[in-house]
């Protein structure tokens, strides 16, 4: 058996462990390959994946670039670098990496979907939708692309189209809570509060700790004049995720509607405190290159 066959077998074994969530066993196989061949592009790429999965994004980027040094034109490596850059808040750099991935492989659906997400974050909705449509043409069975496309359509004010996109995501994966929650947001904005409430409730059946769904549910209940129920829902949202200013703002509005002005004032103060902290953190972050 040749050394290259041995490396291929070890990589295959590592992938089995990797997909099963047995990361230490996977790393044993990948690092064994590197001990025998420090220039093995596959081992470097999969170790980069592990690093990114553990939140070590810069290390993952460095490893992926080493893999590219030994085997250029790997679309998957550029895609991984883009994902890591996104997690580091470097949206424009991430977009450039996804563009490079597509140059390497014009039929790489994941890269088109990731590229679309970056364009959407940059407010370039028309380009984002074009990229989502390309991703979906290549892989029509990706719930993530359908739900992210829906979010972009919603942001562009195309509510009915957004709902249709969320419907497609739900048809592909009925247990994807984000699809139900986002669809409920769109239904609420479309003036369909009862359907929106059912959507939030479905999201919470799937993921009972989804703070965003509790907040959305509270806003719908307020619209339906069920103020005490709405307050209970926003309180639950804050219990789950208390560091989001808009949740405290929503609570303040409800308390004010219930005539509890002192409590509303305290909630407003908490929201202002959180907004100030957010601005402070933002000002200390390095600017996007």
Predicted region positions:
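Structural marker of alpha-solenoid helical repeat scaffolds
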Residues: 36, 70, 104, 138, ...
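TPR-adjacent "capping" and linker segments in tetratricopeptide-repeat scaffold/adaptor proteins
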Residues: 1-9
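TPR/TPR-like (Sel1-like) alpha-helical repeat modules
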Residues: 239, 249, 253-279
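Conserved alpha-helical positions within TPR/SEL1-like repeat arrays
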Residues: 11-19, 42-53, 76-87, 110-121, ...
């Amino acid at each position: 058996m040749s050394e290259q066959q041995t490396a291929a077998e070890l990589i295959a074994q590592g992938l089995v462990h990797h997909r099963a969530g047995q990361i230490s066993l996977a790393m044993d196989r990948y690092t064994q390959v590197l001990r025998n061949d420090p220039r093995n592009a596959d081992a470097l790429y999969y170790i980069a994946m592990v690093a990114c999965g553990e939140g070590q994004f810069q290390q993952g980027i460095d490893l992926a670039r080493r893999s590219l040094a030994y085997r250029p034109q790997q679309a998957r490596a550029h895609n991984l670098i883009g994902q890591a850059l996104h997690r580091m808040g470097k949206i424009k750099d991430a977009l450039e990496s996804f563009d490079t991935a597509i140059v390497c492989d014009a039929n790489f659906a994941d890269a088109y979907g990731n590229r679309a997400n970056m364009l959407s974050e940059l407010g370039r909705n028309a380009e984002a939708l074009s990229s989502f449509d390309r991703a979906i043409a290549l892989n029509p069975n990706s719930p993530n692309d359908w739900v992210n496309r829906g979010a972009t359509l919603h942001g562009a004010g195309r509510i009915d189209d957004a709902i249709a996109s969320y419907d497609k995501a739900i048809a592909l994966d009925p247990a994807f809570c984000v699809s139900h929650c986002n669809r409920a947001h769109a239904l609420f904005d479309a003036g369909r509060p009862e359907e929106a409430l059912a959507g939030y409730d479905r999201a919470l059946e799937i993921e009972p700790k989804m703070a965003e769904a509790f907040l959305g549910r509270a806003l719908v209940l307020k619209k339906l004049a069920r103020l005490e129920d709405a307050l209970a829902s926003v309180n639950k949202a804050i219990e789950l995720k208390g560091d989001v200013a808009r949740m405290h703002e929503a609570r303040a509005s409800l308390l004010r509607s219930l005539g509890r002005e002192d409590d509303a004032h305290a909630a407003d103060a908490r929201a202002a405190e959180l907004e100030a902290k957010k601005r402070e953190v933002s000002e200390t972050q390095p600017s996007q290159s």
